[in-house]
């Protein structure tokens, strides 16, 4: 049995069995007895606490604990008797008898003998007698029931002298009692009575029996045994025997029996209600105003678990039932109502974000559609490149014709300094009136003005030729030819024109100038006329096309 576990009886038991006690505190002992029946585990906890003090190393504490144990057995009824007749208590008794103080062991054995006599009619409480029989077989001696040794062990003082100078031994007390008795005899012989501070020996050694003494019951008492007396609070009891400090023998209209001495009082005028009120009272003031303190509201936040729990409770509730709603349901409903504004704000935020994402989605789809459309259309830069090449060709031709150089007299070729990047040769046919001036060493002003700019010679056709001389193309425009007579006369009158130095250098440039404009006058192209020259007829304009 674990004796060192904390239980509610430890504090009271330690106070009732304190080393500093000079006498038993019967008021506290009876309070402990009353407390035993207030709980289901009260008897077991009380017995554990008492046996813990019985095993104390101080015999003074152990003797007080045995006195408390005897009082509990006498006052607490069968619920405590069953705990005393348990295996755990039997093992504790064996431990005390083997290791305890001799005085403690004698008193414990005397109590066990007394309990055996009390429990002999109840088969549930037969363990005490069996335990005594077992211990006797082991060599432990027990006093006989009602013997003088048992009475002396029970009546042995629980308090052991702590200070030899203040408390006399038992022998000294006996001597003192004898001296007092002798002095009393001498005083009776004298006429004048002499008062003394010490009680008479008869009061100490004889039983105190007061015939006709009456007491009033303070508490109700229900008899647990056949030899006990049942009474109610306020009844008058006639005391027949008060030799035992704990149990008195009394008589009422119900009969004669034993009753606890602490349940009665000698003051016949005392009211039981007043006594109870003084000891244990609970009063309430009617003027007190009861205020309900509401807890502070918790900060609201969206809790999906609570909403699900509320929905589940609402679905499981029967609306046709007349029973009131559960407090938990009302509490959850109030909390969900507090979440309403937060849920509205959350929905507005989600709607705003959804609108923004929808707008972004529309813009992305428009951009992708435009990209797909542009990828599927034909490129626009091809025609623009053709226009740029034609403009570049016209500008290059205008720059290349800035100078005119006479070629050999036989071919009438004129070289014009131009760019090395030119890939086209321009052939010009001169009219007869200009050939005569060329044979005389002079170039007509009209030719000099026409060659550099090429703006007034729009009638001269341009032919697309390759870098190899002699190739012709079917797309070449027709060249204006003067009459044969005029051409022969012009050929006879041709005079070699001196070639300037820069033209010679230009002709000797070699492969760096792969293609140059060639202005050639051939005899076959001259008109064959007699003496008159016909004015040149206008030529058809030739549309220039770039060879890509």
Swiss-Prot record:
Gene Ontology biological process terms, A to Z: positive regulation of exosomal secretion; protein transport; regulation of extracellular exosome assembly
Listed Polar residues bias regions: 517-532
PROSITE patterns (UniProt xref): SH3, UIM, VHS
Covalent link location (Glycyl lysine isopeptide (Lys-Gly) (interchain with G-Cter in SUMO2)): 276
InterPro entries: ENTH_VHS (IPR008942), GAT_STAM1 (IPR047492), SH3-like_dom_sf (IPR036028), SH3_domain (IPR001452), STAM (IPR050670), STAM1_SH3 (IPR035657), UIM_dom (IPR003903), VHS_dom (IPR002014)
Chain positions with Phosphotyrosine modification: 198, 381, 384
Short name of one Pfam family: UIM
Keyword Protease: no
Residue ranges of domain ITAM in the record: 369-386
Phosphoserine found at: 156
Recorded phenotype for the gene knockout or disruption: Mice display disappearance of hippocampal CA3 pyramidal neurons as well as growth retardation in the third week after birth. Adult mice lacking Stam and Stam2 due to inducible gene targeting exhibit significant reduction in T-cell development in the thymus and profound reduction in the peripheral mature T-cells.
Keyword Protein transport set for record: yes
Domain of life: Eukaryota
Principal place of residence: cytoplasm
PTM characteristics: Phosphorylated on Tyr-198. Phosphorylated in response to IL2, IL3, IL4, IL7, CSF2/GM-CSF, EGF and PDGFB. Phosphorylated by activated PDGFRB.
Compartment annotation: Cytoplasm; Early endosome membrane
Disordered: annotated segments: 436-458, 517-548
UIM domain location: 171-190
Subunit and partners: Component of the ESCRT-0 complex composed of STAM or STAM2 and HGS. Probably part of a complex at least composed of HSG, STAM and EPS15. Found in a complex with HGS and E3 ligase ITCH and DTX3L. Interacts with E3 ligase DTX3L; the interaction brings together STAM and HSG, promotes their recruitment to early endosomes and decreases STAM and HGS ubiquitination by ITCH. Interacts with STAMBP/AMSH. Interacts with PDGFRB. Interacts with LITAF; the interaction is direct. Identified in a complex with HGS and LITAF. Interacts with HAVCR1.
Role according to the record: Involved in intracellular signal transduction mediated by cytokines and growth factors. Upon IL-2 and GM-CSL stimulation, it plays a role in signaling leading to DNA synthesis and MYC induction. May also play a role in T-cell development. Involved in down-regulation of receptor tyrosine kinase via multivesicular body (MVBs) when complexed with HGS (ESCRT-0 complex). The ESCRT-0 complex binds ubiquitin and acts as a sorting machinery that recognizes ubiquitinated receptors and transfers them to further sequential lysosomal sorting/trafficking processes.
Annotated family: Belongs to the STAM family.
Entry's free-text remark on domains: The VHS domain mediates high-avidity binding to Lys63-linked and Lys48-linked polyubiquitinated cargos.
Name assigned to this protein: Signal transducing adapter molecule 1
Native organism: Mus musculus
């Amino acid at each position: 049995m674990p004796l060192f576990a904390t239980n509610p009886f430890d504090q009271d038991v330690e106070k009732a069995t304190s080393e500093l006690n000079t006498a038993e505190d019967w008021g506290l002992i009876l309070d402990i007895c009353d407390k035993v029946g207030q709980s289901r585990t009260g008897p077991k906890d009380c017995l554990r606490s008492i046996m813990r003090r019985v095993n104390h190393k101080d015999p003074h504490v152990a003797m007080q604990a045995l006195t408390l144990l005897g009082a509990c057995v006498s006052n607490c009824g069968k619920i405590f008797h069953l705990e005393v007749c348990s295996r755990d208590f039997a093992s504790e008794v064996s431990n005390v008898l083997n290791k305890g103080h001799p005085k403690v062991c004698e008193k414990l054995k005397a109590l066990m003998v007394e309990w055996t006599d009390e429990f002999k009619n109840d088969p549930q409480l037969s363990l005490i007698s069996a335990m005594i029989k077992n211990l006797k077989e082991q060599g432990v001696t027990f006093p006989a029931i009602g013997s003088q040794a048992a009475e002396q062990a029970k009546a042995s003082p629980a308090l052991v002298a702590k200070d030899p100078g203040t408390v006399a031994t038992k022998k000294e007390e006996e001597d003192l009692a004898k001296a007092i008795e002798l002095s009393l005899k001498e005083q009776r012989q004298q006429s004048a009575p002499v008062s003394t501070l010490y009680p008479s020996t008869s009061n100490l050694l004889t039983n105190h029996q007061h015939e006709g003494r009456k007491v009033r019951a303070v508490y109700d008492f229900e008899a647990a045994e056949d030899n006990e007396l049942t009474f109610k609070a306020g009844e008058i009891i006639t005391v027949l025997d008060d030799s035992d400090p704990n149990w008195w023998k009394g008589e009422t209209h119900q009969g004669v029996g034993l009753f606890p001495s602490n349940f009665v009082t000698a003051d016949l005028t005392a009211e039981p209600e007043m006594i109870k009120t003084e000891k244990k009272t609970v009063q309430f003031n009617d003027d007190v105003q009861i205020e309900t303190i509401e807890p502070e509201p918790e900060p609201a936040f969206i809790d999906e678990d609570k909403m699900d729990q509320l929905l589940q409770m609402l679905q499981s509730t029967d609306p046709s039932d007349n029973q009131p709603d559960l407090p938990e349901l009302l509490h959850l409903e109030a909390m969900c109502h507090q979440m309403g504004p937060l849920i509205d704000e959350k929905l507005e935020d989600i709607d705003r974000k959804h609108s923004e994402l929808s707008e972004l989605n529309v813009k992305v789809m428009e951009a992708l559609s435009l990209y797909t459309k542009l990828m599927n259309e034909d490129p626009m830069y091809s025609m623009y490149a053709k226009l740029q090449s034609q403009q570049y060709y016209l500008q290059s031709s205008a720059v290349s014709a800035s100078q005119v150089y006479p070629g050999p007299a036989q071919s009438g070729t004129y070289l014009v300094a131009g760019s090395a990047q030119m890939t086209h040769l321009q052939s010009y046919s001169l009219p007869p009136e200009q050939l005569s001036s060329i044979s005389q060493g002079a170039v007509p002003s009209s030719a000099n003005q026409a060659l550099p700019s090429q703006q007034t010679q729009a009638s001269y056709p341009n032919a697309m030729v390759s870098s190899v001389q002699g190739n012709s193309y079917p797309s070449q425009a027709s060249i204006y030819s003067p009459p044969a007579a005029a051409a022969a006369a012009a050929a006879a009158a041709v005079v070699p024109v001196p070639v300037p130095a820069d033209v010679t250098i230009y002709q000797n440039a070699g492969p760096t100038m792969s293609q140059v404009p060639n202005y050639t006058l051939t005899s076959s192209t001259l008109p064959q006329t007699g003496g008159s020259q016909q004015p040149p007829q206008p030529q058809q304009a030739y549309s220039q096309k770039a060879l890509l």
